Amino acid sequence: MLKEAVSAAECVALQLSNDAERYAELGRKLRSTNYHSAVTVARGSSDHASAYLAYLIMARMGRLVTSLPMSLITLYKSPLVTRDTLAVAISQSGQSPDVVEPIRYFRDGGATTVALVNDTTSPLAESAEWTMPLHAGKEQSVAATKSFITSLVAGARLVAEWQSDAELKDGIAALPEVLAEAAKADWSAALDVLAPARNIMVVGRGISFPVALESALKFKETSALQAEAFSGAEIKHGPMALIEEGYPLVIFATRGPAQA
């Protein structure tokens, strides 16, 4: 898992060196279509990456975005109106029927369908109109690391091309170097705080809340800890009562309006 996590910079660099014209073409398609809304289709870590993408689309493009509830298509056969909708699926494997079948449904109903997927030979890749590879390489660890990070980047690329935002594109281009530096950072100071913990609260707000959700999942998956993520906007409404002396908090304080 650690090896795959620290390789994220290389994976992101590989992704950014590929498919530039395809992303530009997708951006032109998105700008030429008047979508009234967008929907994300994903599960687990990929759903957290989808929440990050949803923040970007709503904040920058002004379109309402919802995460498709699990089993709505596969079990309940709900008659959703899909025309003039953008449907984006995110998946490492591209195998889950709960992701593949909704994308087929949306495409058949006239929606624009995009798959951000690591396995480009998967059923999901074959089902979507637009398939954008993550270029994360094979992931051995059950806990997703490099595929999660490359999913975030792919989502940001989609929005950067849709908005045709040069500043965002420049920020994305700088990511491999920034990630490489982060991988070299000394995180040992956190060990004394986290090692004895049995419960952890993870806090984020706005664009960082999906990352807080993923961090909490990682604590559960890898360390069998009771970790829960909360928005910084809601932490005073109940969660604060759980905090006592010595209770560990992990806070993602990203620059911008949410940091205050």
Placement of each model-derived feature along the sequence:
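An N-terminal, well-structured beta->alpha segment
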Residues: M1-H36, E177-K184
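Short gly/ser/thr-rich secondary-structure transition/capping motifs
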Residues: N18-A24, S67-I73, V114, E181-A185, ...
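Acidic catalytic cores of enzymes that act on phosphate-bearing nucleotides/polynucleotides
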Residues: G62, A195-A258
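Conserved phosphate/anionic-ligand binding catalytic regions in large, soluble enzymes, centered on
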Residues: M1, S7, H48-L53, A212-E214, ...
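Active-site/ligand-binding-proximal alpha/beta "capping" segment
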Residues: I172-V193
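Glycine-rich phosphate/diphosphate-binding loops that line cofactor/substrate pockets in enzymes
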Residues: R22-H36, V81, S188-A197, I243
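Glycine-rich phosphate-binding loops that contact phosphosugars or nucleotide phosphates
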Residues: T33-E177, R205, M240-A260
